[in-house]
């Protein structure tokens, strides 16, 4: 009686099995890889690395064992073949250069022979003496056949003169030029040394006629003396002095002579001083 109600109840007694199956499914789909499969993947990675390393080693060995690095007989033969080919090319180039040089030399020889045949001096007779002048008189062929003795005499004639005559002519021209230069220099006027002098002419007192004093100073006339501007400069106590400019030639007029000539006018001139002296 107590268990009959269980017959009518709808209870899922196998639900845990379905839960376990669902959990295992999702674990396989999203969960960690099981131990055996993880080991298989690690072994696959190691094998792949080993294969990659072997491939790299083979590539490096193939690169180092090139044509230049071959040490066997085959490598030596290939190197010799390359060197022989380069030597053959150089030989051909040198042969072409030699042929070009030979052709150029043959052309030069032909041109020289043609020039020698066409030049008039080649047809002229050889000189009798070893010492010859730069140029000789060449006679026409008919005249040479008529008088061979005259040709020998003409060969001794120097149309341009000897070296001694040339030296004499050069010496004469040099002397002529020196003489002309000396004459030209003599005709050129010589430079005259001149000086500019500023004189201070002092009177006796303030009653001295300064116009008369200046007239007396300017009355001094000498060869090589030229008077210039003048002015009156006050000294003191109403006394003024005459300051006058003049230009003299040094060879003709001296300062002492000039002072003596001015101080001759004793009535007006007390003293003469040189205020400035400049060479021109």
Swiss-Prot record:
**In the record, which positions carry N6-succinyllysine?**
117
Q: Which InterPro entries match?
A: eEF-1beta-like_sf (IPR036219), EF-1_beta_acid_region_euk (IPR018940), EF1B_bsu/dsu (IPR049720), EF1B_bsu/dsu_GNE (IPR014038), Transl_elong_EF1B/ribsomal_bS6 (IPR014717), Transl_elong_EF1B_B/D_CS (IPR001326)
* Low complexity bias locations: 139-148
Q: List GO terms (cellular component aspect).
A: cytosol; eukaryotic translation elongation factor 1 complex
Give an example GO molecular function.
translation elongation factor activity
Residue numbers bearing the Phosphoserine modification? 37, 60, 86, 106, 119, 133, 162
N6-acetyllysine sites (modified residues): 17, 107, 117
Q: Where is the composition biased (Acidic residues)?
A: 149-168
What function is annotated for this protein? Answer: EF-1-beta and EF-1-delta stimulate the exchange of GDP bound to EF-1-alpha to GTP.
Fill in the subunit field for this protein: EF-1 is composed of 4 subunits: alpha, beta, delta, and gamma.
For this entry, the protein name equals Elongation factor 1-delta
């Amino acid at each position: 009686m107590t268990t009959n109600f269980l017959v009518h109840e709808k209870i899922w007694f196998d639900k845990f099995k379905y839960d376990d199956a669902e959990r295992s499914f999702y674990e396989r789909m999203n969960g960690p890889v099981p131990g055996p499969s993880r080991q298989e993947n690690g072994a696959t990675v190691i094998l792949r690395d080993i294969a990659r390393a072997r491939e790299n080693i083979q590539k490096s060995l193939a690169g180092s064992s090139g044509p230049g690095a071959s040490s066997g007989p085959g490598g030596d033969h290939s190197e010799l073949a390359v060197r022989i080919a380069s030597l053959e090319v150089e030989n051909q180039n040198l042969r072409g250069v030699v042929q070009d040089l030979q052709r150029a030399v043959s052309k030069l020889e032909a041109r020289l022979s043609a020039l020698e045949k066409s030049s008039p001096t080649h047809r002229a007779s050889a000189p009798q003496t070893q010492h010859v002048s730069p140029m000789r008189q060449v006679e026409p062929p008919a005249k040479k056949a008529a008088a061979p003795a005259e040709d020998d005499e003409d060969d001794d004639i120097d149309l341009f003169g000897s070296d001694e005559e040339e030296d004499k002519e050069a010496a004469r021209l040099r002397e002529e030029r020196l003489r002309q230069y000396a004459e030209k220099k003599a005709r050129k006027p010589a430079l005259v040394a001149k000086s500019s002098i500023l004189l201070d002419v002092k009177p006796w007192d303030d009653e001295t006629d300064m116009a008369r004093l200046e007239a007396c100073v300017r009355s001094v006339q000498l060869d090589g003396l030229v008077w210039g501007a003048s002015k009156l400069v006050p000294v003191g106590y109403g006394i003024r002095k005459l300051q006058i400019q003049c230009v003299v030639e040094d060879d003709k007029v001296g300062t002492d002579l000039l002072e003596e000539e001015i101080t001759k006018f004793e009535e007006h001139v007390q003293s003469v001083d040189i205020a400035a002296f400049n060479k021109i």
